[in-house]
């Protein structure tokens, strides 16, 4: 059945499209009449949070987005950063949260597909992917189903397309029970003189539809992604898109081949709001109008209405403005790859967005007001109440060895091998470090020494306690993970996941997180070049923890000198960089406090950004000089977990000195800005004393805390734990949980 265009517009219909009464009045004032049903759908799609960023734009403008290496910042399909030698890295992270909760396999799969298109739309060949996943409590009846579906969807699409998944995160928390998070990242390589943009230029030029046919899948997807969930959630399943990675692979090859011919003036992938958003963005950015004839759009279903065709989010589709003389060559390329090619419209000089269907005009709207001049809100926000700092002395001592084993086998700190073994981590043949290290590392093809490092980070429990410090910490940990490989951190993309911005306390979390992120990015010269905001992550009024995911990219000039987390040999000195004399002090909001003592209290660890920069620059220097044989940052679980991960990665044990003060704080405190390093030096070696003195001159604490060797990890006076016992604790939880739902 075809949906007519002359449906009466009622307040109920307006509300069903996610538009507030004042927004609908603004539409009436803008166009001077009642909109058609298709026009209502177009406004609904373009003015929702997912497309317009109407609640967040005011604060996103405060973020640092430029730097000497930045070629393209926010506002395009992806960010672009120069890596020298005429090459650049193109990358972005984006959410597919709501679709993945409704239909986990397709929701996650199309999230991967969408972010890959964002990258190759810019003219880059994708070389790496990551994903940051948050699920509800392991004992929630839906969690196991969601984990299985999401991981299968990511693997199914990414593996088939042919991009290696080199990193990511998985967290569990009851606050995600009704709203999981799926944040997908992709990066690609391009030539700096071969970047393509979405800004249309020139009047009367053909607008060309490319790729797969249009169906009814995903109609209303962008609007669904801008709303809270309620008890009608299952009814939203038809709004989830269906992906085909093999078609996407053909689309990639066809686009890159066409780009090489010089035919492309502007290009935009059809993501959220499909044909509507892609056409509006191309025209609005270029100060041009766009006229589309829907009778020429390739469709795979009969009797599709204009409303459905304009709002369909069928996957693997592109919109381009082409040079007219190149049309035959362009069509030949796309036909060769088995893809549709259709001239569906033209650019105009009247700044109107005109839609024709069945010989009739079904929409005629001002294009700028739909696009870059959409509504913008300065929503009220409240300063959240900050928890007091936790006195570590109030935390009773627990057995260090038992505590370490419990942490290694906990849902949040256990091995993610079950997850990443379902992803192809080695395809393309350039992966130098796969998941399990501080950052994924991929060799830059056609260059003898360069590699790129990738990391994704945020600690939601820190953000819940103090989103300002949590925002700073997410940036700092990402910067630290890149540094720990020896990479120069270049730039980041963010994925800001929050609840309902109409609630001042939620908006307060968002604002403070933005302020923290901005402060950290400025201090660390780590600009934000792309990103995504996902709001209304709530179910029945229950918001997720604030989760501002930060994904960063770093450049390793010579990958033969990169550092890994595995102990490199026996008898090597173990050093702790950037730590206080007592090694660790901060137990507030720590994994140890939560998982061993069952307490979620205190302020998160503060981030001293000047200290972070000093320590990181020193660590990067000693990695590149060859002095350091292994490096690992200290994060969740503190020093003890970092040491255990280094031992498990190598099969080599270590003996660690007894700390001077509290063993709990020393081994499990989550003080920021710390790294564990090893050097092929004896404790009594004069070179080690020189290294420690060099650190002191650089304003960095460097403490010798132990030595590698044997097959056991002994932390101070605690009982020794064999590396095999560590691995058994670490590797067991996830497979048991996914096999039979075991929580032990």
Curated annotation (Swiss-Prot):
GO CC aspect terms: cytoplasm
Enzyme Commission number(s) from the entry: 6.3.5.3
Binding site for substrate: 95-98, 117, 241, 313-315, 534
Enzyme class: ligase
UniProt cross-references to Pfam families, sorted A to Z: AIRS (PF00586), AIRS_C (PF02769), FGAR-AT_linker (PF18072)
Binding-site residues for ATP, renumbered to this chain: 53, 92, 494, 531
Binding residues for Mg(2+) 1: 94, 532
Residues binding Mg(2+) 2: 118, 269
SUPFAM superfamilies in UniProt: PurM C-terminal domain-like (SSF56042), PurM N-terminal domain-like (SSF55326)
UniProt pathway annotation: Purine metabolism; IMP biosynthesis via de novo pathway; 5-amino-1-(5-phospho-D-ribosyl)imidazole from N(2)-formyl-N(1)-(5-phospho-D-ribosyl)glycinamide: step 1/2
Molecular functions per Gene Ontology: ATP binding; magnesium ion binding; phosphoribosylformylglycinamidine synthase activity
InterPro entries reported in the protein's UniProt record: PRibForGlyAmidine_synth_PurL (IPR010074), PurL_linker (IPR041609), PurM-like_C_dom (IPR010918), PurM-like_C_sf (IPR036676), PurM-like_N (IPR016188), PurM-like_N_sf (IPR036921)
Broad class of the protein's primary localization: cytoplasm
Gene Ontology biological-process annotations: 'de novo' IMP biosynthetic process
Catalytically driven reaction(s): N(2)-formyl-N(1)-(5-phospho-beta-D-ribosyl)glycinamide + L-glutamine + ATP + H2O = 2-formamido-N(1)-(5-O-phospho-beta-D-ribosyl)acetamidine + L-glutamate + ADP + phosphate + H(+)
UniProt keyword annotations, A-Z: ATP-binding, Cytoplasm, Ligase, Magnesium, Metal-binding, Nucleotide-binding, Purine biosynthesis
Function: Part of the phosphoribosylformylglycinamidine synthase complex involved in the purines biosynthetic pathway. Catalyzes the ATP-dependent conversion of formylglycinamide ribonucleotide (FGAR) and glutamine to yield formylglycinamidine ribonucleotide (FGAM) and glutamate. The FGAM synthase complex is composed of three subunits. PurQ produces an ammonia molecule by converting glutamine to glutamate. PurL transfers the ammonia molecule to FGAR to form FGAM in an ATP-dependent manner.
Cited NCBIfam families: FGAM_synth_II, PRK01213.1
Family: Belongs to the FGAMS family.
HAMAP family the UniProt entry points to: PurL_2
Quaternary state and interactors: Monomer. Part of the FGAM synthase complex composed of 1 PurL, 1 PurQ and 2 PurS subunits.
Record's protein name: Phosphoribosylformylglycinamidine synthase subunit PurL
Gene: purL
């Amino acid at each position: 059945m075809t949906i007519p265009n002359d449906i009466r517009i009622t307040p109920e219909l307006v509300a069903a499209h996610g538009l507030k009464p004042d927004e609908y009045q603004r539409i009436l004032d803008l166009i001077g009449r009642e909109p058609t049903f298709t026009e209502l759908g177009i406004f609904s799609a373009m003015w929702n949070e997912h497309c317009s960023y109407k609640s967040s734009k005011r604060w996103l403008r405060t973020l640092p987005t430029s730097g000497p290496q930045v070629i393209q910042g926010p506002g395009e399909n992806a960010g672009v950063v120069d890596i020298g030698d005429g090459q650049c890295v193109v990358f972005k992270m984006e959410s597919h949260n709501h679709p993945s909760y409704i239909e986990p396999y397709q929701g996650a799969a199309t999230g991967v597909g969408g972010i890959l298109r964002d990258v190759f739309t810019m003219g880059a060949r994708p070389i790496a992917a990551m994903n940051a996943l948050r699920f509800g409590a392991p004992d929630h009846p839906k969690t196991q189903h969601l984990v299985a579906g999401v991981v299968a969807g990511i693997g199914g699409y990414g593996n088939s397309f042919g991009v290696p998944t080199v990193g990511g995160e998985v967290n569990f928390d009851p606050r995600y029970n009704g709203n999981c998070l799926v944040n997908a990242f992709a990066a690609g390589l391009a030539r700096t003189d071969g970047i393509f943009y979405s800004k249309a230029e020139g009047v009367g030029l053909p607008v060309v539809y490319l790729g797969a046919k249009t169906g009814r899948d995903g109609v209303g997807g962008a609007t669904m992604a801008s709303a809270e969930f309620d008890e009608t959630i299952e009814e939203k399943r038809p709004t989830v898109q269906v992906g085909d990675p093999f078609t996407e692979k053909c689309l990639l090859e066809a686009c890159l081949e066409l780009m090489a011919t010089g035919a492309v003036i502007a290009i935009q992938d059809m993501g959220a709001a499909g044909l509507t958003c892609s056409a509006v963005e191309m025209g609005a950015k270029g100060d041009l109008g766009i006229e589309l004839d829907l009778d020429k759009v390739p469709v795979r279903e009969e009797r599709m209405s204009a409303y459905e065709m304009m709002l369909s989010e069928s996957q693997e589709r592109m919109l381009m403005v082409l040079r007219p003389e190149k049309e035959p060559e362009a069509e030949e390329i796309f036909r060769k790859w088995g893809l549709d090619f259709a001239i569906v419209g033209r650019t105009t000089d009247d700044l109107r967005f005109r839609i024709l269907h069945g010989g009739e005009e079904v929409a005629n709207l001002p294009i700028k007001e739909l696009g870059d001049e959409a509504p913008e809100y300065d929503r009220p926000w409240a300063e959240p109440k900050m928890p007091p700092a936790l006195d570590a002395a109030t935390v009773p001592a627990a057995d260090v060895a038992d505590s370490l084993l419990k942490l290694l086998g906990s849902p949040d700190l256990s091995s993610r091998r079950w997850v990443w073994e379902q992803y192809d981590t080695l395809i393309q043949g350039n992966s130098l470090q796969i998941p399990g290290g501080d950052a994924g590392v991929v060799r830059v093809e056609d260059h003898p020494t360069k590699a790129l490092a990738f990391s994704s980070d945020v600690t939601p429990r820190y953000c819940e306690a103090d989103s300002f410090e949590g925002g700073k910490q997410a940036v700092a940990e990402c910067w630290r993970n890149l540094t720990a490989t020896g990479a120069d951190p270049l730039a980041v993309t963010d994925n800001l996941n929050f609840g309902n911005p109409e609630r001042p306390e939620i908006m307060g979390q968002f604002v403070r997180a933005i302020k923290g992120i901005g402060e950290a990015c400025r201090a660390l010269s780590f600009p934000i070049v792309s990103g995504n905001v996902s709001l209304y992550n709530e179910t029945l009024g229950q918001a997720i923890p604030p989760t501002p995911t930060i994904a960063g990219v770093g450049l390793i000039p010579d990958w033969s000198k990169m550092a890994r987390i595995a102990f490199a040999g026996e008898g090597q000195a173990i050093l702790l960089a950037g730590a206080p004399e007592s090694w660790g002090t901060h137990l507030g909001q720590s994994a140890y406090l939560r998982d061993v003592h069952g307490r979620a209290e205190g302020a998160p660890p503060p981030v001293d950004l000047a200290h972070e920069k000093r320590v990181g620059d020193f660590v990067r220097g000693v990695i590149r000089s060859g002095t350091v044989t292994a490096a690992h940052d200290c994060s969740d679980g503190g020093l003890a977990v970092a040491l255990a991960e280094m031992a498990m990665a190598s099969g080599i044990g270590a003996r660690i000195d007894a700390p001077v003060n509290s063993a709990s704080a020393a081994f499990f405190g989550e003080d920021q800005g710390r790294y564990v390093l090893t050097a092929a030096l004896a404790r009594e070696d004069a070179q080690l004393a020189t290294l420690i003195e060099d650190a002191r001159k650089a304003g960095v604490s460097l403490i010798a805390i132990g030595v590698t060797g044997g097959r056991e990890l002994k932390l101070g006076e605690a009982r020794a734990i064999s590396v095999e016992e560590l691995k058994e604790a670490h590797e067991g939880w996830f497979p048991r949980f996914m096999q039979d739902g075991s929580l032990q």
